[in-house]
A protein has these predicted regions:
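Sec-dependent bacterial lipoprotein signal peptides
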Residues: 1-14
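N-terminal leader/targeting pre-sequences
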Residues: 14-65, 70-173
Length: 173
């Protein structure tokens, strides 16, 4: 009897040792800066089972509605942030969530900034990932999150008529 108890305890303990804890989710972030290098926000990205969660907090931004996109190059040289390239579009679609031939992987909903200059956005998308692959935000040349001066009309190719780039942040682990 004692022998069976020892065998049972050994089997139970070996089962406990093989239970792995869930790995930490992949995360990345982007410090958003304006053309003068001042901090104007932060983006936090987390890989979840439902897609990539993108949370943006903005401050000291001009009030109103602004286009916000993921751009194809992880480089934010002021003052115009043209170094960030065009919208992240590894699937070769047209711009805009309202465009039947779209959207780009980097198309996001507009960011609404209050009169106080503060803004917040929290979305989850399956269009991009932090994991390796063609839609990864961390592969190749990297990517950047860019806030534009005007609202994105969500249909006009290639950039939704959202105007000049007013803030930029490189997506990094």
């Amino acid at each position: 009897m004692r022998r069976w108890l020892l065998v049972g305890a050994a089997v139970w303990l070996s089962g406990c040792a093989s239970v792995a804890s869930d790995p930490e989710p992949l995360t990345a972030g982007a410090a958003l800066k304006d053309k003068d290098g001042k901090d104007v926000g932060v983006a936090t990205l987390v890989q979840t089972p439902d897609g990539t969660r993108i949370a943006v907090t903005g401050y000291r931004l001009p009030p109103g509605t602004h286009g916000i996109h993921i751009h194809a190059v992880g480089d934010c040289k002021p003052p115009d942030f043209a170094s960030a390239g065009g919208h992240f579009n590894p699937t070769a679609k047209q711009h805009g969530t309202l465009n039947p031939a779209g959207p780009h992987s980097g198309d996001l909903p507009n960011l609404v900034v209050a009169d106080s200059g503060e803004a917040g956005m929290d979305i989850t998308t399956k269009a991009v990932t932090l994991e390796p692959g063609p839609t990864s935000l961390l592969d190749g040349k990297g990517t950047a999150i860019v806030i534009h001066a005007a609202a994105d009309d969500q249909k006009t190719d290639p950039a939704g008529n959202s105007g000049a780039r007013i803030a930029c942040g490189v997506v990094a682990k």
